[in-house]
Design a protein with these regions (language model features):
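Ligand-binding loop in jelly-roll beta-barrel domains
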Residues: 87-108
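Structural motif
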Residues: 65-67, 74, 90, 100
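Short, conserved beta-strand element in jelly-roll/cupin
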Residues: 41-43, 54-68
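Short acidic-glycine-tyrosine-enriched beta hairpin
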Residues: 72-88
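A short, N-terminal "cap"/entry segment at the start of jelly-roll beta-barrel domains
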Residues: 1-34, 69
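Conserved short histidine dyad/triad with adjacent acidic residue
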Residues: 23, 36-53
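A cytosolic small-molecule/anion-sensing beta-strand core signal
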Residues: 62-63, 78-79, 97
């Protein structure tokens, strides 16, 4: 577990990671050989190129708005919404505005 998160304290995932102009930054929250939980912040217009998910994954939009390309179709997502990837699903992410998300991935 990441040391930035203290036991017995209330926190907001979206506040653990700042935005940086022109950049995408991420923070591992927790991981082991079977799962990975990461938060990411995207400056407006930045994104991840298409790649395949190594395992099933859930996206939790924490702040702002983004677009997820999944298997050839675009899906708009905003804070409070979620999205699922199947293992091997080809996808990309782009920030429409400054955008933060959490990713929970089950590793095979």
């Amino acid at each position: 577990m990441n040391n930035a998160i203290k036991a017995g304290e209330v926190f907001k995932l979206a506040e653990l990671l700042p935005y940086q102009d022109g950049k995408i930054i991420n923070m591992d929250v927790a991981h082991n050989e079977k799962m990975k939980f990461v938060i990411m912040s995207f400056d407006e217009g930045t994104g991840l190129s298409e790649h395949a998910a190594p395992g099933e994954a859930l996206i939790f939009a924490l702040d702002g708005e983004g677009v997820i390309g999944y298997e050839g179709k675009e899906h708009h997502i905003k804070a409070g919404e979620n999205f699922k990837f199947a293992a091997g699903g080809k996808h990309w992410v782009k920030a429409k505005s400054r955008f933060k998300m959490a990713l929970l991935m089950i590793l095979n």
